[in-house]
Amino acid sequence: MSPKTETKASVGFQAGVKDYRLTYYTPEYQTKDTDILAAFRVTPQPGVPPEEAGAAVAAESSTGTWTTVWTDGLTSLDRYKGRCYDLEPVPGEDNQYIAYVAYPLDLFEEGSVTNMFTSIVGNVFGFKALRALRLEDLRIPTSYIKTFQGPPHGIQVERDKLNKYGRPLLGCTIKPKLGLSAKNYGRAVYECLRGGLDFTKDDENVNSQPFMRWRDRFVFCAEAIYKAQAETGEIKGHYLNATAGTCEEMIKRAVFARELGVPIVMHDYLTGGFTANTTLAHYCRDNGLLLHIHRAMHAVIDRQKNHGMHFRVLAKALRMSGGDHIHAGTVVGKLEGEREITLGFVDLLRDDFIEKDRSRGIYFTQDWVSMPGVMPVASGGIHVWHMPALTDIFGDDAVLQFGGGTLGHPWGNAPGAVANRVALEACVQARNEGRDLAREGNEVIREAAKWSPELAAACEVWKEIKFEFESVDTL
């Protein structure tokens, strides 16, 4: 090797592979108000130190790669790199840690959940040095929140639009979810709405199939809404699912819904994607439509305790991307949801300021700086006997959605809707009178059933129905 070549090698950058923790593990770092903070549940491979695992997460989800590159010298890594600033062992687990990572705000495009997730939950989840990785929570700084529109309208504006106050809203998913013709589908909608429900809903997998094209469904559902409104004197709605194969087709369906004059449309935000969801949310804000969000596919992402992403993160992302309702579990029905954890992310959806509370899975204090709230939807295996618990757990600002619990009534859809409305009104009145629904709920329902034959029939049908499985969504 010539002396000239040796000189260049000695003054050049130090090529090769070095431990991530030398650059990305910084326990002395003081987080900034503008940082996005993440709490990851990290399970390192055997022999990988926790500091190296946490640093690898910070590196691979920000500026790092597997080897040193000369272009590191063309930027300021100290300004742009993610930092693992704290590690704590998970109680009861041998080799599992909560790694806290801080990301500088400049790493993310303004107003883009898509870009935020591409970095934070991107390729790092396939990293070989980690046996498993789960994103438990995010702290979104106020400076980043202010770059998002958020929900098209929010809870208070929705109540004003519907002129409904002081109680939860009632909904129903039309069943069978697939196979009905548009006219029969519209008939089912009408029967439910005239019986006393506020909303009916397209199932998440109803889009535009051969047995029922979307335009036909929209027209017959609009007819059902107007007829039910005329008969009851109440504002009614049906969640018309605008989810489609392209953003252009999705917006076309939303435009047609607006032209029909209906109050609300629907989107499957995970299968449709965050870019499509934000696009639709902006359209709904500009055109006065409420937006109902279904979370189909969420359990693929959030149900495994050690890998993936907790639903509280998906809930925060939805509030940023935009939606007025989102399904959030029931605690008491057939779908997943442990009480304190569910109420933790329900608060993250509805409230403006949420304190850190590890007992409910909330790792960071979150300030939404007046971004409108999202109404949680309780849906899945619920019926009239659950009404006291649901009213007690969720309070007024929620949608209680009974699909089979309405349509399965032995006398038909309208009596099923009557039963649910009577049960709800009885529970709200009892609560307002100071009665303890958790203790006296069954008695409240029995008393109401004495003067409502529809409720009495529903109570008889579902008196033995329970879904007693242990939740896997635990701390």
From Swiss-Prot:
Keyword annotations from UniProtKB, A to Z: Acetylation, Calvin cycle, Carbon dioxide fixation, Chloroplast, Disulfide bond, Lyase, Magnesium, Metal-binding, Monooxygenase, Oxidoreductase, Photorespiration, Photosynthesis, Plastid
Q: Where is this site: Transition state stabilizer?
A: 334
Kindly list the positions annotated as binding Mg(2+): 201, 203-204
Where's it found, cell-wise?
Plastid, Chloroplast
**PANTHER family named in the record:** RIBULOSE BISPHOSPHATE CARBOXYLASE, RIBULOSE BISPHOSPHATE CARBOXYLASE LARGE CHAIN
Q: Which family is this protein grouped under? A: Belongs to the RuBisCO large chain family. Type I subfamily.
Q: What is this protein called?
A: Ribulose bisphosphate carboxylase large chain
Species annotation: Welwitschia mirabilis
